[in-house]
Amino acid sequence: MKQLTRLWTLLILPCALAIGASGAAVQGMTSAVHHGASQTRARPQTLPTLAAYNLDWSNVAVAGISSGSDMATQLLYAHSSKIKGEATFAGSPFFCAQDDALDALYLCAGTEYGPVPVSTLEYDTDNASCIYMDCVSNLKGRYAWIFSGTLDSVVAQSVAKSAQTMDTFYGISATTNYTTAAEHGWVTPDVTTSCSTLGEPFLINCGFDAEQTFLTGLFGTLNARNNGTLSGKLIQFNQSPYAAFDMDSSAYVFVPANCASGSKCKLIVALHGCEMGQSFIGTQFVTESGLNEWADTNSIIVLYPQAIPDSTYNPYGCWDWWGYAGSNYSVSGGAQLSKIWAMMQRI
């Protein structure tokens, strides 16, 4: 617990303190957005635009780790009529932080504020349903793969389990893994970092292929993984037309060869966590996530949006799951969420 509190104090508490001790997190953060708060942007590059492909909208899913897990959940709930499911590592329930950085720290990562008030989150979600987001009735029959390691010192297992509780309330079919002795990280067979390791790049090997497991849950039976030279291409593209508060000027998309040639293809959006964007670990997440090898042989396009840090509200380049970019961060009109959705629609 001490390790959990220490790490999340580093990640989120500076954001809360920067806007005052009153706890009025959203108001301060939103004000900064509208008054031109400075951001650290990647150097502009001459890159291709994101291309359009022949997307099979019946097979669109999202995945993420930590803050990326929470953004994935926000996308699923906000666009439940289109997104069929999600895979999450170390995530929390939809709208868990409730526009408050301190709740994010002490309720949705640690447990100092007590258990997650799932019934309150469900009440708020019901009030937003069909107005600020797709109707929650669309969630019935969707799929969620939820992973939380027994050694995770950043996001408590009880938080991940509360996400399962909320998903089940809305009729989402959840498959869970709460028994692996894993620290806080994205589980992939493509790294040698031990399962119990905490720290950058937050990619860990736990002796099984998590991507095979959740991609099968999302899309059905898979062709064999390509363990050789990939026929598809990893493309760095200009994200600037889609970039909102704390989004980088470039991002990545992996496109299998047959998808580039016009075949109808599936899509999964893979969202990195804090300190995992390219400004921290380069292309490690986009090349070692374990997704591209399965995507190459299964007609799956993989979109890797990129977030960046700023010195005031988001020093570790997290996706917005507590309101630093505006109080509507978790619904369809959210600054980052709407831009990621625009990229998905472009594909």
Regions found by a protein language model. Give the residues of each.
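Low-complexity, Pro/Ser/Thr-rich intrinsically disordered segments
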Residues: 23-46
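Gly/Ser-rich "nucleophile elbow"/oxyanion-hole loop immediately N-terminal to the catalytic nucleophile
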Residues: 45-67, 77-83, 133-141, 258-262, ...
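Primarily recognizes the serine-hydrolase "nucleophile elbow" in alpha/beta-hydrolase
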Residues: 56-103, 223
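The feature captures the conserved acid-bearing segment of alpha/beta-hydrolase catalytic domains
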Residues: 94-171, 214, 255, 259-261
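Cap/lid segment of the alpha/beta-hydrolase catalytic domain
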Residues: 99-108, 192, 196-197, 276-285, ...
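N-terminal cap/lid segment of alpha/beta-hydrolase-fold proteins
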Residues: 110-127, 221-262
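Active-site-adjacent alpha-helix of alpha/beta-hydrolase-fold enzymes
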Residues: 150-175, 180-182, 197-202, 281-304, ...
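Short beta-strand element of the alpha/beta-hydrolase
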Residues: 263-275
